[in-house]
Curated annotation (Swiss-Prot):
The chain crosses the membrane at residues 8-25. SUPFAM superfamilies: Prokaryotic lipoproteins and lipoprotein localization factors. Induction: Expression is controlled by a sigma-E-regulated promoter which needs the sigma-E factor for the binding of the RNA polymerase and subsequent transcription. The lineage of its organism: Bacteria, Bacillati, Bacillota, Bacilli, Bacillales. This is Sporulation protein YdcC. PANTHER family: SPORULATION PROTEIN YDCC. It is found in: Cell membrane. It is a single-pass membrane protein. It comes from the Bacteria. GO terms for biological process: sporulation resulting in formation of a cellular spore. required for efficient sporulation. The gene is ydcC.
C-alpha cells in the first residue's frame, strides 16, 4: 500500500512539474512586448537588408533597401529601384537630415525630427514603438515567429491605418511588415533578408559627402536625363478641384509644364526635365522627407517637391493640407496626351 501511495505521489509530482514547465514556456503578449522593449534598449547598432514592394500606381514599385543605424541618432537608408536605375539615400547625422539623389548630384537638407515623427516600416525601433503604443494590438505566436497587428502612425497618410509586423523568435529581429489600407489590402510590404545587431561602423558611414560619392558609383551618373518626358497628371484631386490651365513654356533645358488647378481649393503643379548639377549641391528646407511610394519627396507647409524618372516636380499651394499634397503627388501615375 505504501509503495502504491509513493508511486502515486511521484506520478502526481511529475505531472505538476510538467504542467509548470509547460506554463513557463508559453510566453504571453506582455512578455513578448517586454522582450522587444529590452532588445530595443540593449542594442548599440544594426545593419539590415530588405525588399520593399509598394502597391501604388499602375504597377508595383520594388526597392532594394539597406538600413544602417547607430545609437543614438545616426541613420542611413539606401533605396534602390533596379528597374528605373534610380537610387536615393536618407541620412541623419549631427548636421541634420538629408535626402541624397546621387544620379543628379543633388541633396536636400531638412530641419526635421525624422525618423521619430511617424511610423517607419524598415526601422526596428519604430516597429517596436508602434507595438508598444497600441494597447489593442492583436498578437499571434507561431512556431518561429511573433506576429503583431497594430495601428500605424503616419502623419500625412490616414489611408494606411493598419500594419502586420512579424518578428523572429530567435533574436527578436523583424522578419516582415505589411501595411494595409482601410479595406485591408496590402499596399506596402517589407521582407527582410538579413538583420544583424551590434555591427561596427567607421566614422564616414553616415557622412553626407562620402555617401553621395559612394552612391554615385552604383548608378550611371554619366547618363543624361532625356530631353523629352511624358507629362503626368494627378489621378486623385481634392473634392471640387479641377484643372483650369496648362502652359507649355520653352526653357534653355527643354520645356516646363505649368498646371493650374482651382475650384474649392487651388494649387500649381510644375514639371520639367531634371538637370545634373555640375557640382554637388545641397538645398536646406524647413520641412521633412516624405515617402511617396515611388520616390522620396521634400514636404514643407506650402509645397512638395520630388524627382522621379529624370523629371523634377513641384507642387505648391496655400490651400492644400500636407496630407492632400501627398495624396495628389502619390497619384501622379497618369499620362496626359502630350
Amino acid at each position: 500500500m505504501k509503495k502504491v501511495r509513493k508511486s502515486f505521489v511521484l506520478l502526481l509530482t511529475g505531472l505538476l512539474a510538467v504542467l509548470i514547465l509547460s506554463a513557463c514556456g508559453q510566453k504571453t503578449q506582455q512578455d513578448i512586448v517586454a522582450g522587444l522593449d529590452e532588445k530595443a534598449k540593449e542594442y548599440t547598432s544594426y545593419k539590415a537588408k530588405a525588399k520593399m514592394t509598394i502597391e501604388t500606381g499602375s504597377e508595383p514599385q520594388v526597392y532594394n533597401v539597406e538600413i544602417w543605424h547607430k545609437k543614438p541618432s545616426l541613420y542611413r537608408v539606401y533605396l534602390e529601384n533596379p528597374k528605373k536605375d534610380q537610387n536615393q539615400v536618407i541620412l541623419r547625422n549631427e548636421n541634420g537630415v538629408f535626402v541624397l539623389t546621387p544620379s543628379l548630384n543633388k541633396s536636400f537638407r531638412f530641419q526635421s525630427d525624422w525618423p521619430n515623427n511617424s511610423s517607419q516600416v524598415y526601422l526596428f525601433e519604430s516597429l517596436v514603438k508602434d507595438v508598444q503604443n497600441d494597447s489593442d494590438a492583436v498578437f499571434t505566436a507561431k512556431e518561429k515567429k511573433y506576429v503583431f497587428e497594430t495601428k500605424t502612425n503616419y502623419q500625412h497618410n490616414k489611408m494606411l491605418p493598419t500594419q502586420e509586423i512579424t518578428f523572429n523568435k530567435k533574436d527578436m529581429s523583424p522578419s516582415s511588415v505589411k501595411v494595409m489600407d482601410t479595406d485591408r489590402k496590402v499596399m506596402v510590404k517589407v521582407e527582410f533578408s538579413s538583420f544583424e545587431f551590434n555591427k561596427q561602423f567607421d566614422k564616414e558611414s553616415f557622412d553626407e559627402k562620402k555617401n553621395m560619392t559612394l552612391s554615385q558609383m552604383d548608378v550611371a551618373t554619366s547618363a543624361k536625363p532625356s530631353d523629352t518626358f511624358a507629362v503626368k497628371t494627378p489621378l486623385e484631386l481634392p473634392l471640387g478641384v479641377k484643372l483650369l490651365e496648362e502652359k507649355d513654356i520653352s526653357t534653355e533645358d527643354g520645356k516646363r509644364i505649368i498646371m493650374t488647378y482651382g475650384g474649392e481649393k487651388s494649387f500649381t503643379l510644375i514639371q520639367e526635365k531634371a538637370q545634373i548639377a555640375k557640382a554637388s549641391s545641397s538645398v536646406t528646407l524647413n520641412g521633412e522627407p516624405v515617402n511617396l511610394g515611388y520616390t522620396i519627396g521634400a514636404l514643407s507647409d506650402a509645397s512638395l517637391s520630388w524627382t522621379y524618372d529624370g523629371v523634377d516636380y513641384l507642387l505648391s499651394s496655400k490651400d492644400l493640407s500636407k496630407e492632400e499634397m501627398v495624396t495628389v503627388a502619390k497619384s501622379m501615375q497618369g499620362q496626359s496626351s502630350k
